[in-house]
Amino acid sequence: MPNQPVITPRGLRSRFSLVAVVLGFGISAASGADAGVITGNVSNAATRNLLSGARVEIPSLALGALTDDTGRYVLAGVPAGSHEVLVSYIGLDSVRRQVSLAAGQRVAQDFDLTTGIYKMDQFKVVGEREGDAAAITAYRNSENLKNIAATDSFGNLPNLNAGEVAIRLPGIYGELDAGGNLAGFTVRGMTSGLNSVTMDGGLMTGQGGMGRSIFVNNITGAMFEQVELVKGHTPDKGADSLGGTINFKSRSPLSMREKRRITYTVTGRIAPSFTQQIPIREDRRLHGLATLGYQEVFDAFGGSRNLGVSLTLFNSETAIGSFFTTRDYQNTMTSPAFLWDYRWDDLYNHRRQKNITAKADYRLTPSTKVSFLGTYIDHSEVFRRQYNVRAFTNGQAQDTVPSATTSIVPGYTSRITTVRPVASSVIDVTMTGPNNFFNRLRRVDAGFEHEKGPLQLEGNLRYTQTHINIGNGEGAVLTNRITGTGWIIDRTESDLYPKFLANGGLDFTNPANYRPTANGLSNQNDQQIHEVTEGRLDGRYTLPISAPVFAKAGVHWREQHVGVRSASRRWSYTGTTALPHDPNLLTMDRRMTGRAIPQWEASWFMKSREVADPSIWREDLYFRETTKYTTYRDVVETVTAPYLMGQGKLGREGWAGRTGFLGGVRWEKTENEADGWVRARVLSTAAQQTADPAGSATRDYANNRRVIDGDYTKAFPSVHAWHDWTANLKTRLSWSTSFGRPAFGNLSPAETPNETQRAITINNPALLPQTAKNWDATLEYYFEPVGNLTVGWFHKEIRDYIVSGIESGTVGTGSDNGYNGEYAGWTILSTANAGTAVVQGWEFSYQQQFTFLPGLLKGLSGMINYTVLDTHGNYGGTTRRGSGQIAGFVPRTANASLSWRYRGFSARLLVNYAGEFLQSYGAASPARNLYRMERTLINLGLSYQLRPSLTLTLDVDNLSNEPQRRYRGVIENMEYFNYPGTTITFGFNGRF
C-alpha cells in the first residue's frame, strides 16, 4: 500500500517531548510573586446576560483583557494605586470607573453596560440586537478568519434547526433533501464530506454510513448560542476541513445576572389548505414543537455564584410532503431530444425528535473551572412512504437511434415522445415503506480550565456516538411491472404534469396486467455506527516580556469508529395472478393529470419482516447469507496531533500595540485499521447457490476476511496577522493549511478481480487526504450602532485528489501474499493521490442596525452577503477544467435580511440564494451534464411581544414555494422538479 509519511515516528516523539518541556516550563514559571489583580464580570443591564468579548482596559498602563464566555475578566499585573478602568462593547455605551487597589491585592469590580436605545419604550425587543452585537464582537476579537452568527440573529427558526443559521453565513451552500430540509453544507465550493462540523470544538458524528458528511437535521438551535464558520485554521484546532469548519457553540450557564431563568417555546407547523400539497400530506397538516429551558446559578460549597446549571428539553414532530419528477433524454445538445425515462414520485415523511441537553459550569476557585455537557437525542421516522412510477425504454436509452423497430418512434418533437408497445417498453410501479429510521445520538463532554500566574491550562474528554437503525421495518420495497405497453408523453400544455396517453399494447391502468419483478419484494434492515472519542490538553504561557505575547502547546487525540451492518432480504413472486392493489390511494400525479396508474402497498405483503404468504414468495437465500459478509465494514481511525504556536501583539502601545499575530504548526499522525470480507476469486455457480445457499456463501466469502491498515503523518503550519488602522478599521492576512480526509468507504477492504486483464482492484487504507494551502485577506470596517462591512479575498491551492485505477504493485506468491495465495503475479490497481486545482473567490458582507434614522425607521436593520467563486485545475484528471466543469462547485451564493422593530412588534424577511451550478459532469458528452438551477428561498417572520414572558410568533417557510430544479444538457430538458411546499409556523415563547 502507498505510505509516504512526512514525519517519522521518531520525529513525532521528539515533538511530544518538546510539548512536555514547554508545559513543564510554564508550570515551574507560574510560581512567581503575587501581583495586583482586578477581576469581575461585565453584563448587559437590559438583558441581564453576561457579555463575552467585552474589552476591559486601563489605558494609562496599556493593560487590557477580554471577558471570557462567562463574562469574566482578569486584569493581572496591576500596580498599587488608583486607576481608571475603561469597559467597552459593540452596541453599548462605554463605562469608565476609578478602581483602587493595594500591592498584591485582588479587587472584584463588576460592570453593567447599557445604551440609550434600550431606554426608549418603542424598542422593547433587544435579544436580536444583543445577538448581532455578540457575533460582531466575537468576529472582531478573533485571532483568525471566521464568520459568526448568533442563533437569534435571524428571528424565529421555523424548524429550530441550527443549520438554518449556518446557511446564512458567507460562502455556505445549504444542501437540501427531497423534502426541502437542510441536510448538509458546501463551504467555499467544497462538498460536505470534506468539511467538519463540530460542537464546542469537538467533532460531531454523522449519518452517512461510510462517508464523512455530517447531517444537521437532528441538531436543534435551542442548544446553541452562536454558529461559527472557521476559514483560517489555527494549530490548536483541527485542520481537517478543506473548505471550513462549522462549529456550534453552546452558552455557559454562568453567563447571566439573574438567579434563575426559564425559557419556553410552543409552536405548531401547518401546511395550509390554500397551498399546494400532496394528498397524503393534506391528511396530516399540523404538527407541534416545544422547548423548555432552565438555567440557574448557585452559591456552591462556600462560593458565590460559582455553579451554573442549564437544562434544555426539546420535542418536535415534523412532516414533509413533496411531489417530484425525474427524467432522462436523448444524448444530444440539439433540439429535439426524445424523453426515454420518465418518473414521478410522491414522498411523505413524519419525523419525531426528542432532545435533552444538560450543562454545568463549576468554578472551584477564581482560577479553576470545571464543566460538563451531556446531550441525548432520539430522532425517529416511522412513516416514510414513497410512491414511484417509472415509464422507460428498457435497454434503449439515451444513445438509441429511433427506427422502425425501436421503442422510440421517429418523428418525436421537443415536447412529444411516442413509445411503441414492444417488450422493451416498461412501466415499473414501486412503493417503498413505511420505512423506519432510528437515530440515537449521545454526547458527553467533561472539561477543565485553570490559571496560575502566566500559565493557563485547559483540557477536555469527549465521547459522541450515533447509532442508526434504518430500513423498511414492518414495510418493504415492492416493484410491480408491465411490459409491452405503449405511451405518448405530451408536454405541450404542461411540462410538470404532461399528458400520458395510451399507445397500444397492454392497458397500463389495469392492475391485472402487472406482476412483481424478479426479487421485486425486499426488506432492508441496516445498522450504522459512528463513534468519536476525543481528548485534548492545552497549555498557554504568557511570556515575561513587555509585549503581550504567549506561547501555546498541546496534544489532541481522537479515535473514530465507523461501521455498517445489514440483515436485508429479498423475495421473488411465484404466484400466477396479480397482487391486490390499493384502489383508494390518491397520488399527486393522479389528481393533476387524471391518469390512473394502479398503486400497491408493500406493507400488505409483509409481517414482522417475513412475507405474509410464504406460498407465493421465494426468498433469495444466497443473497440473505452473503449480505452478512458483503455489507459488513468496520474502520477505526486514530489521530494524534501535537502542536506549537505563538500569539500576541508586537507591543503594548501605538502601531505595534495594534498589530497582532498568530503562528505555529500542527502535526497529525493518522492511523487507519479496516475490517471486512471480500469475495473469493471463483464464486459458486447459480445451481450451487440455489441448492446450498449457506454453504455457497461460506465458500465465497467466509475465508476471505481482510484486516488492512495504513498510516500517514503530515504537518499543517499556519500564520495569521491583523492590524487595527483605526478604532473602526481592521485588516487581516493569513496563510494556512487544511485538508479533507477520504471517505471511510475508500479505506475499507474491497477487491474486484479482472481475469481478462489479470488485475485486481483494491482499496487503499493509507490513502492521503486532499490538502490545501490557503491565503485569506480581509478589510473590515465597524460602525456604531452594531454594524460592520467586510470585503474578503481567498485563494486555495488544492492537491492530492483521489484517483482510482492507479498501478500500485504486483501480487506476490505464496499463501501469505495477502490474498490467500490467489492472484500471484497480477497487477494491483488501487486509489492514490494526484492532481491539483485552484479555488479562489471574493466574499462581501454588510450588516447594520439603523437606529440613527428618524422616527419609525429607527427600528430597521439589514444584512447582506455575497460570495463569488472561481476554480480551475485538472482535479486528478488529465485535462484542465474550469468552474462550469466541476460537479458540486457552487460559484455564487448570497443572503439578505431586512427586519423592522417597533415597540413589541418585529418583522423580518430572509432571502437565501444559490446560483446555477453543475451537479454531475459528463466528460464524454456535454449533453449528459446535469445542472442544478438557481434557487431563491424566502422566509417571512412576524412576532409581537406582549411582555417578556409572552411573545406571539408567525413564520412562513418557503414563501414562494420555490422548487428544486435540475436540467440535463440544455435548459429545456428538465431532469428534476420538486415542489417541497410552503408551511406556516405559529406559536408563542417567553422568558421568566
In which residue ranges do the predicted regions lie?
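Periplasm-facing N-terminal accessory domains of Gram-negative outer-membrane beta-barrel systems
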Residues: 29-128
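Outer-membrane beta-barrel signature, preferentially recognizing the C-terminal barrel domain
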Residues: 430-443, 631-637, 710, 739-798, ...
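A beta-strand signature from Gram-negative outer-membrane beta-barrel systems
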Residues: 206, 218-265, 302, 322, ...
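Transmembrane beta-barrel wall of Gram-negative outer-membrane proteins
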Residues: 282-422, 429, 436-447, 453, ...
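Gram-negative outer-membrane beta-barrel transporters
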Residues: 794-797, 802, 807-809, 813-921
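Short loop/turn motifs that connect adjacent beta-strands in outer-membrane beta-barrel proteins
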Residues: 253-260, 299-307, 367, 453-458, ...
